[in-house]
Regions:
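A short, acidic, flexible beta-alpha connecting loop/helix-capping segment that sits on the rim
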Residues: 175-182
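Outer-membrane beta-barrel "beta-signal"
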Residues: 94, 98, 161-163, 182-193
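Short glycine-rich, acidic/polar surface loops and turns
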Residues: 115-118, 156-162
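Short, contiguous acidic/charged loop-to-helix segments that flank catalytic cores in large enzymes
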Residues: 81-87, 143-152, 177
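C-terminal hydrophobic structural anchor segments
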Residues: 119-153
Length: 193
């Protein structure tokens, strides 16, 4: 892997990431079960100190008698799609984001004893928003469709907007809503982008 990214408070802001990997699995009897190959590249292109573009292209393939099923869908992998709603032994995913600051600070205050206990959860600093387009899909190898789905690549996409709200203890609330193509909404609590 190669990583030249420079990070800011919200995550990667400039640079590139390239990752490739191969994994092989055996079953309980020591016989070959599957081999997975993945390839991913990301590019972060700053516009200003706090805004910029993020691009991602990822693909994967699993072969063998019991191949891995890759799963996508939800806030971090194929926004606008149902959570874990895209699956198969092969996948291609591309995404492009425009990330911009929305609010430097927004908060609320309570009175009484709860004021100090709730303070970390009522202050939000450096809220970001933006627009995205995600495209791709997953499909099964020929003759291997255990859960239904496609055994050929059928492209799909979602374009919409997102909101990232950093909270106490380094966690981020992430909301996204597809407006064109797949129109799902997602909510996620986690860290980073």
């Amino acid at each position: 892997s190669l990583d030249t990214t420079v990070w800011n408070y919200h995550g990667p802001h400039s640079g590139n990431v390239f990752f490739t990997g191969t994994e092989m699995a055996v079953d309980s009897q020591g016989k070959f079960s599957s081999m997975d190959m993945i390839l991913e590249g990301r590019n972060y292109l700053p516009i200003t100190e706090r805004s910029g573009f993020a691009f991602r292209l990822a693909s994967g393939k699993s072969v063998g008698p019991d191949p891995t099923i890759f799963v996508m869908g939800g806030n971090k992998a194929f926004r606008g799609m149902p959570f874990l709603g895209v699956y198969g032994n092969n996948y291609i995913l591309g995404s492009a984001d425009l990330r911009v600051p929305l609010f430097d600070f927004i908060g609320a205050q309570t009175s009484g004893p709860s004021k100090h206990a709730l303070w970390p959860f009522m202050q939000f600093i450096d809220i970001q928003s933006g627009v995205y387009i995600d495209g791709g899909n997953a499909w099964y190898n020929k003759g291997q469709t255990p859960y239904g789905g496609n055994n050929t690549f059928v492209p799909d996409y979602s374009a919409g907007y997102f909101l990232n709200v950093p909270t106490a203890f380094g966690l981020t609330l992430r909301f996204s809503r597809g407006v064109y193509g797949q129109k799902g909404s997602t909510f996620w609590i986690g860290y980073n982008w």
